[in-house]
């Protein structure tokens, strides 16, 4: 009997309780397909149980992302409907929670595996039911069909589910390192299901109605990266066009190999080969985002090229002996770098410079001081290789004598050809056992010989480009056939060859690096000598300055200051300041301290402290002046004209002006200032080194990188916010110096920032999401509910035990607002720090956090920001002697503690049996991994109770203990010797990059344990450094083959562990039978055989379902830190999506433009204009009947992109597929807007027109609150000198019904974004305020009212029946008539149009309020400009160089 509608609704409610993400869909239950689809019912199968429509659906006033249709007559029971919901929601909707590129990869991975034994039964079923459908449709049906058997209990441990699902998705769909199996599909499905359960996944792919993300039917699934590369190179080898087959003439170094202009580094290894194989003439390659970051744009329709990278290390939290994270002084986890024993791969997509518009020209490389031939000759000599010249035309390397033979130099047509040949043979020479140790023992003409030639040839190409000596591959054409065969037999061979070629390149170029270092040292020494000579000025030059006085010294020390300095050998400026321009003041400070009888760390503000500081500053100033004069004399270039000056300024050169009154150089700081000088007063410094440029730009106790970084960080904030940050930072410095007290600091932060910071603020902030629960404000995360607001707290450094360590700072509505406030406060902390190194570290932390929050940031951007932060922190640490002393003391204490604990007293470890899939749970509880015993254990001092389920011998253990534990009898006698041997092994923690060294010392690889161990003939001393106790951080254990096999058995429906009536699987190479899911009681329908010999493998058969799996061990695992979402085609897909969107929007703009020809200007007000009480303005159109209103929308350049259509009843819509963001309508026209004294921007047209009537000039309609900020930014960029006013809507009624005021919030955000002012209408009393005598309305009470209203309406329509007194209870829960009326009144009074026509204040109220606001903004702008002018003049005065400061 079919299920009833009420029963179906009950099943669905239970389903969405299990999967709250399913609330994004509407559910439509009808008796049959005819009721669902009407005339189109014939288009669907008659026995269809359900259908998913990926189209936005409106129901009961709410928009849903899609709809599930269910014809009830085809659904037999609740369980039948449940499977239908899983199929449609978890399957089809779940597939659309992948981004388009990821879904494409998912379908490809499924299609590629359609003949795999574990998936073939599913595919056969789908092929039968969906014959004739595309491969994509059938692949998605396979995914959905598997979802029918998914239950919440199968994916309850979220972290493990996400890890396994992401690993399977990465390996089988993205990297495609192996075909998908049934267990992989199960892992991916569980990952999606869990995402819908915890609402971490939502729709990202938006196909058209009943249309999948399609591709051509004959398009084969994407091949693995190495196969794609190999096939391309095979084609080019046959055609003679492979990268290393192309000759090029000698010329500029680094002109041919692919490079990334953003990082300045070239691509290496197979990436370089693959990019060169694309046949581009431009050597520059970069990602889509890197191009956008420099203002360039990948052209529409261009396709990217994938490159791959390997990760050999990763950061992990450092743990103490109890397994808990080690925290630093600020409470943050300490990170440590772990070298991976099993490296991981990830991909990126790059575009060539020829595919990118607007890319800046490539900057020329730094010119070397020697030519290519000299460089090559030096490399040959520095290598020490034995090179002989003989008659004939043969060049070769002989391994037996370790020597190179070359023809006589005169036989070569040019010196470049000679050195190219010599360096090719030197490449072979590097393969000797004493160097890079490659396999060279192959006869001429053999396959092995050809492989070595491939390595040398690629290396020659790389070295030839590096040196600029050209490349001639003609002599090696004989190897082409062998190369093609090698790549056909093993596509990975070219990857190995390219990697070896890079090693050859590095080894060879290392000889040149010695020369570079020697030259750098000589240059540095010469520079130091030049600076020392410039600073060889007698100290009297400073001490005899009449503007300064150091009389206190003689009064207190009884000796003149000059005598005291000379007696200590300090007779010149350089002897006091040293010769390092970056350390002039610091060196002077330290060297002058003994003269004043105080320690360098002395900080008491007595006379000695003050005079030492003042004198050090005077000598540092003098040293800087002398150094600058020396640089100008050595490198300065006279500017010959104003055009020359502006050109040099644009090139970033430093320009100095010489005043007539003092003749001393003064650095020009702006283009306006530059124009104030005649050319003969100016001199440029184009040749400064980076270090010298940094010194020349040093000012105000800040290093140049700090200045630049601070300026860049501040630039993202409005001008008034920047001023507040700087003033609060100044107050923080004053507080630290004791110039103000804590209360004054708190007052200053309140005044300049709008929030109050505690005087003992440590610099740490905490953002907490909060919500209201049972009338109390609670931490949303702890309560397990969605946050309704966010609060910012500051840590108090001086909080005593028992006190609250955090002080409340402010509350915000959104997390973004809280993060923006936190960034401003962190900038206050950084800029308020005197120590330049600590300041730089704090600014680097702010920058890293900003990059991390940026949704457009790439992994490369995030990594670069992290490295910059780590570098800055290291610099701060190295320059903090106290911190170094504390660290050394802690290390000494820890070492003493360990030495004091005798070996015999170390507690015995408590080992536990942890299945691989539960390792993350055990690790989070504090368990540690013992590599020797191959088992997890509970660290001493850790509570063992949480680990009880894994205790050895526990009945709930899912798998057998690791090899350290005795094998169960069921494993059979044949396995015992192997297990005993494994148990006795001494395992090692060998990073992947050091595997060859360990292997050479006698280490062997254990395939089962995935770890190296000490071999029977190993050199134990050489392997000592890789013992686990000597390796600080190690990679986590890989899944054992037995655990992998158990996963495969479970995916095929076979029971394992205690459920299988024995401890299965038993990996002894024998046949075993076990029960299966759905099998009869006592039946053993499952068969398997598994072995651990060689490469672990096995076979699994489910005789009930017909599943037959041939299994092989994967051999490695990915950690949960990686969460690998490898996006080999992500940038390309984004570019394609942008191209399609641009095309659609351009087509719409043209269509709308043509439509304008059929419209007429408004002569009589349309129904909409009449309802709003506004007059017709030029530019607004109507139809020939004069009923509809058409409002064109333009961008800031005047191009029309779309149009707003307003029906007679006020219904509004925009042209389909049109561009609205940043578009607006200028009330009065674009010309009038350009002439307006201010930019007044409103939400809707009616408000903008009303305001235009009041102010008498053009205004702007942005159409809705969400578009205010984009319009304000576009117009502010167009008219930067016009003040901006946002005339916003004040939606007070929505605060009560929905908890927020979007009109006010969006208007304020838009004003803040452009430094403008937001204004809102002020109504007469009671017009826009809620009566105090009525009960308050909250979002919850309003929702309750709506639900009760709908329930009563359904009852009145006969749709539902109310039981007992339900109607009375529903009515009692509703809002009263007075409350509804008050809400209605408030809703009618929100904008300036309402103020003009619905308020008793009327149009005069609009004129008064708008006029006053504009006048005030204009006055403020005028004062701001005047203030800027005064500050500029003052800055010019302060920047005039002073020889000394007067000391009292």
From Swiss-Prot:
Residues 964-982 have a biased composition (Low complexity). Residues 844-915, 952-982, 1414-1448 are annotated as: Disordered. Required for autonomous replication in E.coli. Transferred into the recipient cell during bacterial conjugation. Catalyzes the synthesis of short oligoribonucleotide primers with CpA or pCpA at their 5'-termini on a single-stranded template DNA. It comes from the Bacteria. GO terms for biological process: DNA replication. Coiled coil: none annotated. One of its GO terms (molecular function) is nucleotidyltransferase activity. GO terms for cellular component: DNA-directed RNA polymerase complex. This is DNA primase TraC. Its EC number is 2.7.7.-. Keywords: DNA replication, DNA-directed RNA polymerase, Nucleotidyltransferase, Plasmid, Transcription, Transferase. Residues 844-856, 863-872, 882-898, 1418-1441 have a biased composition (Basic and acidic residues).
């Amino acid at each position: 009997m079919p299920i009833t509608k009420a029963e179906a609704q009950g099943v669905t409610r239970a389903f969405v309780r299990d999967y709250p993400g399913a609330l994004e869909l509407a559910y439509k239950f009808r008796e049959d397909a005819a009721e669902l689809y009407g005339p189109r019912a014939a288009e669907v199968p008659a026995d269809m149980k359900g259908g998913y429509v990926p189209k936005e659906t409106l129901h009961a006033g709410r928009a849903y992302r899609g709809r599930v249709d269910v014809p009830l007559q085809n659904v037999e029971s609740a369980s039948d409907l449940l499977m239908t919901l899983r199929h449609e929601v978890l399957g089809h909707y779940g597939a659309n929670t992948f981004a388009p590129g990821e879904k494409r990869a998912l379908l490809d991975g499924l299609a590629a595996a359609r003949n795999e034994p574990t998936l073939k039964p599913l595919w056969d079923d789908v092929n039968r039911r969906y014959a004739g459908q595309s491969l994509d449709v059938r692949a998605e049906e396979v995914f959905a069909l598997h979802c029918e058997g998914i239950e919440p209990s199968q994916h309850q441990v979220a972290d493990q589910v996400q890890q396994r699902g992401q690993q399977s998705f990465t390996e089988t769909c993205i990297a495609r390192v192996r075909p998908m199996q049934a267990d992989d599909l199960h892992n991916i499905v569980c990952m999606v299901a869990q995402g819908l359960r915890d609402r971490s996944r939502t729709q990202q792919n938006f196909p058209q109605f009943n249309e999948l993300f399609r591709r051509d039917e004959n398009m084969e699934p994407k091949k693995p990266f190495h196969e794609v590369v190999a096939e391309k190179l095979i084609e080019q080898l046959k055609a003679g066009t492979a990268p290393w087959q192309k000759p090029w003439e000698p010329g500029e170094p680094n002109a041919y190999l692919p490079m990334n202009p953003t990082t300045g580094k070239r691509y290496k290894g197979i990436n370089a080969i693959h990019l060169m194989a694309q046949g581009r003439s431009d050597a520059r390659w970069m990602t889509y985002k890197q191009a956008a970051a420099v203002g360039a744009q990948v052209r529409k329709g261009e396709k990217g090229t994938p490159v791959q990278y390997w990760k050999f290390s990763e950061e992990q939290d450092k743990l103490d002996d109890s397994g808990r994270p080690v925290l630093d002084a600020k409470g943050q986890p300490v990170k440590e770098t772990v070298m991976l024993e099993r490296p991981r791969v990830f991909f990126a997509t790059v575009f060539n410079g020829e595919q990118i518009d607007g890319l800046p020209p490539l900057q020329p490389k730094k010119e070397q001081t020697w030519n290519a031939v000299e460089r090559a000759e030096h490399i040959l000599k520095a290598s020490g290789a034995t090179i002989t010249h003989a008659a004939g035309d043969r060049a070769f390397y002989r391994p037996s004598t370790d020597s190179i033979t070359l023809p006589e130099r005169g036989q070569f047509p040019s010196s470049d050809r000679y050195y190219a040949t010599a360096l090719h043979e030197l490449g072979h020479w590097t393969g000797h056992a004493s160097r890079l140790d490659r396999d060279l023992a192959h006869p001429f003409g053999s396959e092995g010989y050809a492989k070595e030639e491939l390595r040398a040839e690629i290396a020659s190409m790389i070295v030839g480009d590096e040196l600029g000596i050209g490349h001639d591959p003609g002599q090696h054409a004989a190897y082409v056939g062998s190369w093609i065969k090698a790549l056909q037999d093993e596509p990975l061979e070219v990857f190995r060859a390219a990697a070896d070629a890079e090693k050859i390149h590095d080894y060879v170029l290392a000889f040149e690096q010695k020369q570079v270092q020697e030259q750098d040292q000589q240059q540095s020494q010469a520079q130091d000598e030049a600076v020392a000579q410039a600073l060889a000025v007698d100290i009297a030059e400073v001490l005899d300055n009449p503007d300064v006085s150091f009389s206190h010294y003689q009064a207190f020390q009884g000796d003149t200051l000059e005598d005291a300095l000379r007696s200590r050998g300090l007779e010149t400026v350089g002897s006091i300041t040293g010769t390092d321009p970056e350390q002039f003041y610091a060196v002077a400070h330290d060297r002058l301290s003994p003269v004043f009888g105080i320690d360098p760390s002395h900080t008491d503000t007595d006379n000695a402290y003050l005079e030492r500081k003042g004198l050090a500053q005077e000598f540092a100033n003098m040293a800087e002046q002398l150094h600058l004069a020396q640089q100008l004399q050595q490198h300065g270039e006279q500017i010959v004209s104003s055009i020359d000056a502006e050109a040099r300024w644009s090139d970033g050169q430093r320009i100095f002006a010489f005043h007539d009154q003092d003749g001393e150089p003064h650095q020009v700081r702006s283009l306006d200032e530059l124009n104030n000088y005649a050319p003969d007063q100016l001199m440029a410094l184009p040749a400064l080194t980076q270090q010298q440029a940094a010194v020349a730009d040093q000012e105000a106790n800040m290093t140049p990188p700090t200045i630049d970084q601070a300026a860049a960080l501040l630039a993202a904030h409005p001008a008034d916010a920047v001023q507040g940050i700087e003033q609060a930072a100044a107050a923080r410095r004053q507080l630290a110096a004791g110039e103000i007290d804590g209360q004054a600091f708190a007052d200053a932060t309140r005044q300049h920032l709008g929030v109050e910071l505690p005087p003992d603020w440590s610099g740490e902030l905490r953002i907490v999401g909060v919500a209201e629960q049972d009338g109390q404000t609670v931490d949303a995360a702890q309560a397990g509910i969605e946050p309704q607001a966010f609060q910012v707290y500051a840590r108090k450094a001086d909080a005593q035990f028992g006190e609250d360590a955090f002080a409340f700072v402010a509350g915000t509505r959104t997390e973004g607002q809280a993060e923006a406030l936190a960034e401003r406060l962190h900038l206050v902390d950084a800029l308020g720090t005197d120590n330049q190194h600590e300041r730089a570290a704090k600014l680097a932390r702010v920058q890293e956090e900003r990059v991390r929050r940026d949704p457009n940031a790439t992994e490369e951007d995030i990594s670069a920001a992290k490295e910059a932060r780590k570098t800055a922190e290291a610099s701060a640490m190295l320059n903090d002697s106290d911190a170094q002393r504390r660290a050394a003391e802690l290390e000494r204490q820890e070492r003493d503690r360990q030495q004091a604990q005798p070996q015999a007293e170390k507690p015995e470890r408590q080992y536990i049996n942890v299945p691989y899939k539960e390792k993350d749970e055990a690790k989070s509880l504090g368990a540690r991994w013992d590599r020797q015993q191959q088992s997890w254990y509970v660290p001493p001092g850790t509570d063992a109770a949480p680990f009880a389920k894994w205790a050895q011998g526990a009945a709930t253990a899912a798998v057998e203990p690791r090899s350290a534990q005795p094998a169960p009898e069921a494993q059979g006698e044949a396995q015992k010797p192997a297990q005993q041997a494994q148990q006795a092994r001494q395992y090692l923690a060998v990073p992947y990059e050091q595997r060859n060294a360990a292997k050479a010392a006698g280490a062997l690889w254990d395939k089962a344990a995935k770890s190296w161990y000490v071999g029977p003939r190993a050199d134990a001393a050489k392997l000592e450094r890789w013992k686990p106790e000597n390796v600080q951080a190690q990679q986590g254990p890989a899944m054992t083959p037995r655990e992998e096999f158990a996963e495969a058995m479970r995916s095929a429906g076979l029971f394992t562990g205690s459920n299988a009536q024995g401890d299965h699987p038993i990996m002894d190479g024998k046949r075993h039978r076990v029960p299966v899911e759905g099998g009869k009681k006592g039946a053993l329908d499952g068969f398997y055989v598994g072995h651990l010999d060689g490469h672990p493998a096995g076979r699994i058969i489910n005789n009930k379902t017909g599943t037959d799996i041939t299994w092989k061990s994967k051999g490695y695992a990915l950690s949960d830190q990686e969460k690998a979402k490898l996006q080999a085609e992500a940038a390309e897909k984004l570019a394609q999506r942008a191209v399609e969107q641009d095309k659609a929007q351009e087509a719409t703009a043209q269509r709308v433009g043509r439509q304008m020809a059929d419209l007429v200007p408004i002569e009589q007000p349309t129904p909409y204009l009449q309802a709003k009480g506004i007059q017709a303005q030029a530019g607004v159109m109507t139809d020939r009947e004069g009923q509809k209103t058409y409002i064109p929308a333009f961008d800031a350049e005047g191009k029309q992109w779309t149009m707003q259509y307003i029906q007679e009843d006020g219904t509004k819509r925009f042209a389909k597929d049109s561009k609205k963001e940043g578009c607006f309508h200028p009330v009065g026209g674009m010309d009038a807007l350009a002439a307006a004294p201010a930019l007044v921007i409103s939400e809707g047209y009616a408000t903008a027109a009303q305001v235009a009537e009041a102010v008498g000039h053009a205004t702007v309609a942005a159409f809705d609150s969400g578009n205010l900020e984009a319009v304000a930014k576009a117009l502010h960029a167009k008219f930067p000198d016009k003040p901006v006013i946002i005339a916003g809507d004040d939606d007070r009624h929505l605060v009560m019904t929905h908890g927020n005021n979007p009109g006010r919030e969006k208007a304020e955000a838009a004003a803040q974004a452009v430094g403008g002012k937001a204004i809102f209408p002020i109504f007469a009393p009671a017009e826009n305020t809620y009566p105090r005598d009525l009960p308050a309305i909250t979002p919850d009470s309003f929702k309750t009212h709506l639900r009760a209203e709908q329930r009563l309406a359904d009852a009145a329509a006969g749709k539902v029946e109310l039981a007992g007194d339900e109607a009375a209870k529903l009515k009692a829960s509703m809002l009263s008539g007075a409350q509804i009326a008050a809400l209605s009144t408030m809703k009618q009074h929100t904008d300036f149009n309402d103020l003009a026509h619905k308020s008793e204040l009327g149009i005069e109220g609009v004129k008064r309020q708008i006029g006053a606001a504009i006048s005030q903004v204009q006055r403020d702008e005028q004062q701001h400009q005047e203030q800027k002018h005064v500050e500029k003049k003052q800055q010019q005065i302060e920047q005039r160089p002073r020889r000394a400061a007067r000391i009292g």
